Amino acid sequence: MVLDELISEFDRGLRSLTGISRMSRPVPAPAEAPAAELTPAERTHAAGLMRVNHVGEVCAQALYQAQKLTARSSAAKAMFEEAAREEEDHLAWTAHRLKELDSRPSVLNPLWYAGALAIGVAAGTLGDKVSLGFMAETERQVESHLDGHLSDLPAGDTASRAIVEQMRADEAKHGKAATDAGGIELPLPARMLMRAASKIMTRTAYYL
């Protein structure tokens, strides 16, 4: 049973890194078509933002895989699995949008994935309450980050905006579920360290 689980998670990891993500929900569609085509500068900027979001989803897969494998209770395992499935939709959506923008994922995705996997294992070994608290804080920070992207995306990029809005709704749901399941609030130094690491990742992934 453990071997089957490891093989399944290894397969998910490979799909995350190779761009063969499974989509259980269709790509969110904008409510209205853009008034005009994006300029080259707007496309480049939108692609940078969506590349950052794609990296975030690569990291989410690694985090939740590690936390699921190290979780003590079946309830916590199920929660991490459900979140990972929805985050895989996000991974596929952002990859799809990057292709539409004639861009690509981050060349550093293997590095981001490995780092997130190690962090997820570390959080998981501290127990389910800490691990769920880490999940809740991660989702809060991601939700805030997506709010910033909604303000920063070109006004005419309704396609990216529709994706980010659905991602934000899902992240809020995951964070609340983790808190409701008993996740504890992380100490301030841990939260600050997470924010600092996130800034490094987002600034790098925008370009690379």
From Swiss-Prot:
Pathway(s) of this molecule: Cofactor biosynthesis; ubiquinone biosynthesis
Record's cofactor remark: Binds 2 iron ions per subunit.
UniProt xrefs under Gene3D superfamilies: 1.20.1260.10
GO molecular function, one term: metal ion binding
Cofactor list: Fe cation
GO biological process: ubiquinone biosynthetic process
Record's subcellular location: Cell membrane
Record field: catalytic activity: a 5-methoxy-2-methyl-3-(all-trans-polyprenyl)benzene-1,4-diol + AH2 + O2 = a 3-demethylubiquinol + A + H2O
Function: Catalyzes the hydroxylation of 2-nonaprenyl-3-methyl-6-methoxy-1,4-benzoquinol during ubiquinone biosynthesis.
NCBIfam families hit by this protein: DMQ_monoox_COQ7 (NF033656)
Protein name, per record: 3-demethoxyubiquinol 3-hydroxylase
Phylogenetic lineage: Bacteria, Pseudomonadati, Pseudomonadota, Betaproteobacteria, Burkholderiales
